[in-house]
């Protein structure tokens, strides 16, 4: 472990994790400073005191020192050596002190001016490739030529002088390339390609075990993964840490040596794993410490570098002193930490860690660590599915409870929702609940008494009565409630929802400690550690102290459920008229009827087969395309059993699995079914069948109960016939693979080492890469990675699972997908069918993969249809409903304009008005197709730059202040008030989008963002005078993610990130305005540069009176 702290005080109904994370950085920095001071002064570090009582204010220099030490500490572990080089020359910029010893360079000639031999500094400035054999140097040059350099790791190199082998693990930093060199044993099987692939096969077997587990049990999933990691790595103890919403951690699964103390159930404060460390785990998902007692090695670097080398992604980065001290205190010498990353709503989220500890030094070779990382990626996908399923079940339960409560409100007294079952306690997890209505109080479970509830309600009315969303807090003490202490540990957290000015629903939670148990919590007299010593037991004690007077936090889904019930209650008690008039109901019924008729027409005329069954498996839907394929008319198909009368015997098990899952609410994608064909008089034709690739989709009634299953498919009969023929041919596979027949699907093959051994003509046409370019290349990383860029990490993981399952001889699920971009940037999605080829001994020597392109244009994907329709409805609703508040804002603007206001107030009003016009343009005038094609209608009006500047800055000021970041603005005085002509709102839209993305990706806290605008040459044209303007949006740090920039600048279909799509449209819009944008990375900063020619009525020298910006 290391360091971390937590807190979540009172809040409204929507949590703000960004603020708590920022505050957490300050707490972590304070602990770091305390520890560093203790080392400097020789005094003991009191861990518990520092965690329990962090300072209220942390100096900026402490935070800077903390982040710098974490990222640029200048020390590496001694089990390998590090070399940093310049690109593309490979000139050495820095290296670890032990490099000469590792590479056997003791006889290197002197390069120092003094003539004294300095075996380390003497290496700075030379070509690093000369330290290795010629073939090793060539391998390093090849790796450096690829954009995604890490995909080729590890590069096997040999020292020129000793011929010793090393794993070279490469990554890019701001200064160049960092090479972590880890010694490899000459006889190690992992040195060979076959040995490295064998590690992946071991991981795939572990993944297969994860996939075979029954759903709905996250505990079993965690238990299995710790067993698999322990089996792969051999550590004495392997645990799963889960990070909770308030950032504290918990050991939720463990496998250990029998003589070791159990940590299962241990909770520890957030400071034990700092925010900076968590950020690094998302960047570098495997972290190994070989020996915490070993003395770190210093990194020596060239004097031309302005700051220490960034070691964030270095496999050798030395652990911090407090971390090694903690490990030593718990009896651990070596550790391996593996990040568990899942997708959040907006970005990836560090859910937890799998951590191995060993009681003696332990080194795990890179190929095996890479296999563990692969296992973690697959585990993350499986965990994400389980979390989504659990969330869906919880949401459905909440909706059912809300429905029952609403029914009670309609036919019973209001107190029934507390006194009857189910009641409001069933809506969310809580220890007690209360209803305060018209001065009376109803209580259930563990609650304050009536007078205390009344006092709490009065405090809520006085202090939070204006908050339309209610109040949630995990600590009434921190929320400032005066009577919190008197409630004791029984009531610490509360969720309050007011449904009128003085009527409230309240849910209560008790102290966190009451729900937490750990077998190691009891302090034994023999134990030597005291409260101030860093140890799991003191972590647990510190956590309980930090969590004192605090309950478990309220989850967002729970807050949403409470908020929904509050709205229902408010409507029930304030509405004195029917919700809908008779005319309204009739109109809505007509609209619904029209919508249903249109959907029936779309389904019936679709070019994809669509059919459905009721809950008993009998057909109740059969469109025209399905009838054409099978020869069975809809009138004859209705009522037949899909499993017994339509589907072929070999597909019956797959269908029954689909139906079982769908009727439980779990939908599947890309499952192959074989359907019978029917001849005259509707008799089955047993000599032929049709193959469809289907997606299942649940059908529900108005109460959300599942009443059937719909299947949306794609006809793959001809492709399946070719695959079957290929299997029959067995050894004579070249007949099909080398055929130029356009009906042959894309096919590629892998040898036993995951290298490409076949790539047919259809594959060449699909990907744009010729056979000679890919044959012999590694399929993972090179072919699918460097050549065919994979859509995202999840897509790559799914492909790797299918690939290694195929070459390991395991069955590859027919629903396996591969998603990538071809050479021209076109997005490809295909299902994979695998067929292995074995030698006479039964060993797999080759595996063929057949691609079936998922044609979304010719078919209707039911889940996607639902999702698209829902998204369209949401968008239509937002665009419509936002107009009323916009009209209100516009009316308020008009009133203010006509009143007496100061000049500065008028300037703020103009900024607000410009923001309102920007929103109006987005919702009323946005035509994405016209933007893509460069045909959007541009408007013309007179404007000044200072007004645009005020407007775009106002849109990022809140986030800048939250992050404690500075804004630096440099605008040439002569152009601030220069009258310009053009589409002001669209230029404002473009600049605001660029600035927002710059702000979102600037490091924080205590960083800065810059804007500069400078004039260029004036031009004269037939239609007037123009001035060239250059805008720059600047921020320090590593820059925007490559996926986002690819979305913005590459001319491919589709997009990976929503922000990338927005930037792409901004670029297109700017190009239509005869402007251009570029993104520039420099050593210390990155920036967007916009060059634009704007029409002006006056020259720069004859500008009007200067103004000043209202935002500084």
Curated annotation (Swiss-Prot):
Domain (PAS): residue spans on this chain? 595-666, 732-803
The GAF domain covers which part of the protein?
217-387
- The record places domain Histidine kinase at 877-1096
Per UniProt, the keywords (alphabetical) are: Chromophore, Photoreceptor protein, Receptor, Repeat, Sensory transduction, Transcription, Transcription regulation
What residues bind phytochromobilin, as annotated?
A: 322
Top-level taxon in the UniProt lineage:
Eukaryota
- SMART domains reported in the protein's UniProt record: GAF, HATPase_c, HisKA, PAS
Q: What's a GO biological-process term for it?
A: red, far-red light phototransduction
Q: Provide one Gene Ontology cellular component.
A: intracellular membrane-bounded organelle
Reproduce the UniProt comment on modification after translation.
Contains one covalently linked phytochromobilin chromophore.
Concerning InterPro entries, the annotation shows:
GAF, GAF-like_dom_sf, HATPase_C_sf, His_kinase_dom, HisK_dim/P_dom, PAS, PAS-like_dom_sf, PAS_2
**GO MF term set:** phosphorelay sensor kinase activity; photoreceptor activity; protein homodimerization activity
Q: Which family does it belong to?
A: Belongs to the phytochrome family.
The UniProt subunit note reads as follows: Homodimer.
Q: What does this protein do?
A: Regulatory photoreceptor which exists in two forms that are reversibly interconvertible by light: the Pr form that absorbs maximally in the red region of the spectrum and the Pfr form that absorbs maximally in the far-red region. Photoconversion of Pr to Pfr induces an array of morphogenic responses, whereas reconversion of Pfr to Pr cancels the induction of those responses. Pfr controls the expression of a number of nuclear genes including those encoding the small subunit of ribulose-bisphosphate carboxylase, chlorophyll A/B binding protein, protochlorophyllide reductase, rRNA, etc.
What is this protein identified as? Answer: Phytochrome E
The protein's organism comes out as Arabidopsis thaliana (Mouse-ear cress)
Gene name, Swiss-Prot/TrEMBL:
PHYE
């Amino acid at each position: 472990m290391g360091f971390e702290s937590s807190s979540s005080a009172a809040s409204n109904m929507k949590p703000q994790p960004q603020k708590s994370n920022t505050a957490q950085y300050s707490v972590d920095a304070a602990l770091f400073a305390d520890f560093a001071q203790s080392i400097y002064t020789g005094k003991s570090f009191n861990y518990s005191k520092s965690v329990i009582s962090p300072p209220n204010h942390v100096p900026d220099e402490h935070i800077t020192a903390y982040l710098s030490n974490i990222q640029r500490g200048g020390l590496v572990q001694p089990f390998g050596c590090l070399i940093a080089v310049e690109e593309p020359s490979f000139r050495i910029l820095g290296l670890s002190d032990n490099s000469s010893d590792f590479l056997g360079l003791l006889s290197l000639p002197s390069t120092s001016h003094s003539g004294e031999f300095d075996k380390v500094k003497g290496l700075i400035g030379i070509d690093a490739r000369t330290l290795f054999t010629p073939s090793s140097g060539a391998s390093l040059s090849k790796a450096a030529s690829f954009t995604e350099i890490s995909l080729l790791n590890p590069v096997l190199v040999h020292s020129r002088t000793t011929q010793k082998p090393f794993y070279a693990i490469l990554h890019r930093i701001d200064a160049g390339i960092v090479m972590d060199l880890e010694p490899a044993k000459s006889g190690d099987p992992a040195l060979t390609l076959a040995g490295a692939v064998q590690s992946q096969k071991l991981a795939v077997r572990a993944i297969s075990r994860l996939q075979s587990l029954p759903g709905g049990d996250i505990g079993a999933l965690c238990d299995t993964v710790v067993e698999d990691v322990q089996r792969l790595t051999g550590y004495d103890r392997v645990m799963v840490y889960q990070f909770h919403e308030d950032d504290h951690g918990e050991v939720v699964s463990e496998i250990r040596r029998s003589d070791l103390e159990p940590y299962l159930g241990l909770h520890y404060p957030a400071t034990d794993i700092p925010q900076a460390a968590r950020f690094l785990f998302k960047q570098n998902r495997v972290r190994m410490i070989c020996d915490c007692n070993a003395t770190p090695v210093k990194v020596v670097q060239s004097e031309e570098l302005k700051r220490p080398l960034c070691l964030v992604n270095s496999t050798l980065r030395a652990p911090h002193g407090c971390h090694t001290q903690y490990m030593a205190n718990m009896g651990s010498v070596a550790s391996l930490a593996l990040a568990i990353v899942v997708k959040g709503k907006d970005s990836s989220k560090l859910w937890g860690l799998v951590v191995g500890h060993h009681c003696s030094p332990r080194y795990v070779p890179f190929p095996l660590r890479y296999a563990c990382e692969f296992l973690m990626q697959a585990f993350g996908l499986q965990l994400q599915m389980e979390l989504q399923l659990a969330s869906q079940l919880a949401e459905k339960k909440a909706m059912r409870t809300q429905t029952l409560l609403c029914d009670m409100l309609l036919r019973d007294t209001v107190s029934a929702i507390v006194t009857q079952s189910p009641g409001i306690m069933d809506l969310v997890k809580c220890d007690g609940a209360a209803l305060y209505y018209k001065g009376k109080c109803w209580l259930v479970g563990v609650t304050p008494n009536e007078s205390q509830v009344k006092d709490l309600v009065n405090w809520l009315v006085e202090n939070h009565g204006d908050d339309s969303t209610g109040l949630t807090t995990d600590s009434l003490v921190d929320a400032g409630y005066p009577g919190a202490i008197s409630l004791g540990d029984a009531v610490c957290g509360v969720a309050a929802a007011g449904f009128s000015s003085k009527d409230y629903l309240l849910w209560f939670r008790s102290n966190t400690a009451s729900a937490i148990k750990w077998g190691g919590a009891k302090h034994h007299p023999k134990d030597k550690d005291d409260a101030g010593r860093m140890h799991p037991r003191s972590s647990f004690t510190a956590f309980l102290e930090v969590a004192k007077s605090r309950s478990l936090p309220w989850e967002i889904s729970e807050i949403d459920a409470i908020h929904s019930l509050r709205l229902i209650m408010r409507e029930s008690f304030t509405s004195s008229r029917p919700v809908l008039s008779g005319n309204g109901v009739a109109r809505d019924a007509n609209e619904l009827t029209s919508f249903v008729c249109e959907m029936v027409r779309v389904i019936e005329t679709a070019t994809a087969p669509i059919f459905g069954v009721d809950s008993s498996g009998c057909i109740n839907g059969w469109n025209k395309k399905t009838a054409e394929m099978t020869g069975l008319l809809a009138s004859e198909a209705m009522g037949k059993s899909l499993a017994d009368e339509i589907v072929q015997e070999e597909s019956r098990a797959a269908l029954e699995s689909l139906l079982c899952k769908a009727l439980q609410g779990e939908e599947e994608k890309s499952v192959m079914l074989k359907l019978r064909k029917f001849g005259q008089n509707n008799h089955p034709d047993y000599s032929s069948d049709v193959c469809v690739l289907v997606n299942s989709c649940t059908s529900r009634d108005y109460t959300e109960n599942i009443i059937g299953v719909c299947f949306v498919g794609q006809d793959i009969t001809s492709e399946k016939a070719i695959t079957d023929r290929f299997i029959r041919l067995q050894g004579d596979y070249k007949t099909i693979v080398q055929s130029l027949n356009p009906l042959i699907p894309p096919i590629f093959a892998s040898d036993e080492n995951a290298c490409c051994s076949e790539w047919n003509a259809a594959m060449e046409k699909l990907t744009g890469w010729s056979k000679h370019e890919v044959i012999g290349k590694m399929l993972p990383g090179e072919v699918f990675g460097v050549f065919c860029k994979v859509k995202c990490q999840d897509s790559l993981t799914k492909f790797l699972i299918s690939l290694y399952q195929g070459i390991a001889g395991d069955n590859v699920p027919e629903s396996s997908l591969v998603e990538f971009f071809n050479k021209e940037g076109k997005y490809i999605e295909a299902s994979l069918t695998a067929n292995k080829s074995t030698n006479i001994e039964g060993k797999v020597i080759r595996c063929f993969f057949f691609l079936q392109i998922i044609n979304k244009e010719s078919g209707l994907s039911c889940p996607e249809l639902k999702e698209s329709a829902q998204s369209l409805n949401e968008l239509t609703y937002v665009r419509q409903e936002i107009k009323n508040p916009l009209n209100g804002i516009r009316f308020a603007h008009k009133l203010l304009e006509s009143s007496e206001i100061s000049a500065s107030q008028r300037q703020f009003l103009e900024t607000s008005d410009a923001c309102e016009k920007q929103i109006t343009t987005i919702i009323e005038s946005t035509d994405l197709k016209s933007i893509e094609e460069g045909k959007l209608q541009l408007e013309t009006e007179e404007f000044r730059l200072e007004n645009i500047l005020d407007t775009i800055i106002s849109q990022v000021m809140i986030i800048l202040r939250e992050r404690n970041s500075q804004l630096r603005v440099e605008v040439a005085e002569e152009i601030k008030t220069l009258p310009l002509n053009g589409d002001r709102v669209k230029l404002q839209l473009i600049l605001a989008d660029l600035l927002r993305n710059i702000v979102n990706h600037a490091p924080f806290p205590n960083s800065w963002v810059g804007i500069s605008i400078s004039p260029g040459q004036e031009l004269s044209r037939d239609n007037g005078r123009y001035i060239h303007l250059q805008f720059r949006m600047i921020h320090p740090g590593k820059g925007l993610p490559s996926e986002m920039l690819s979305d913005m600048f590459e001319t491919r279909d589709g997009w990976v990130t929503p922000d990338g799509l927005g930037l792409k449209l901004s670029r297109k819009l700017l190009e239509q305005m005869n402007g251009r944008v570029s993104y520039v990375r420099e050593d210390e900063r990155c920036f967007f540069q916009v060059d634009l020619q704007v029409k002006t009525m006056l020259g720069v020298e004859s500008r009007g009176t200067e103004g000043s910006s209202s935002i500084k």
